[in-house]
């Protein structure tokens, strides 16, 4: 009712209602963990120096939370997206690798909004065109349709959380 969290190894993201923030927060969690011999740090590994942060100040598993067109996207770190298209898995042809990697990177770029998406796809498509390869990156509108189709499979925010947490 007042606390929801997602945990992956030593990474976590926790939402705490304002009603509890005075007694249960990042600082009190760090203090309790210290008493059991564990060190609790925020995502910057600088320690817990504040009781809480706004969602737009948090990262989790290399994702930050961006308001794009009135919805919050869990956007992958830009450096990670740009690095994705620089690597090739063994056993794939150049075209297979490009199709696989660039379509995934294109969707990740889409989550940052149209400005970054257009810059990113222009860079990738320009380079691939010069090599005679086709990126397979969908248009921004196609990613919008794909996202709408995916989100329409859920009937509530609870369904989405259950999908994300595997419960």
Residue ranges: model-predicted function:
Residues 19-31, 35-39, 49-167:
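Active-site and adjacent loop segments of nucleotide-processing enzymes
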Residues 45-46:
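Non-transmembrane, aqueous-exposed alpha-helical and coiled segments at domain scale
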Residues 1-18, 62:
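Catalytic palm active-site di-aspartate
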């Amino acid at each position: 009712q007042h606390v929801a969290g997602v945990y992956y190894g030593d990474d976590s993201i926790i939402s705490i209602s304002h009603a509890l923030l005075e007694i249960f927060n990042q600082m009190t969690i760090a203090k309790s963990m210290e008493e059991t011999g564990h060190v609790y740090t925020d995502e910057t590994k600088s320690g817990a120096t504040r009781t809480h942060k706004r969602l737009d100040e948090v990262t989790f598993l290399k994702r930050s939370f961006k308001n794009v067109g009135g919805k919050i996207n869990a956007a992958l770190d830009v450096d990670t997206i740009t690095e994705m298209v620089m690597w090739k898995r063994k056993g794939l042809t150049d075209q297979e690798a490009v199709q696989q990697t660039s379509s995934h990177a294109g969707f990740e770029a889409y989550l940052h909004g149209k400005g970054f998406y257009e810059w990113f796809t222009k860079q990738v498509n320009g380079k691939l065109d010069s090599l005679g390869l086709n990126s397979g990156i969908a248009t921004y509108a196609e990613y919008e349709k794909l996202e709408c189709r995916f989100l329409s499979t859920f009937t509530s925010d609870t369904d989405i959380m259950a999908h994300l947490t595997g419960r």
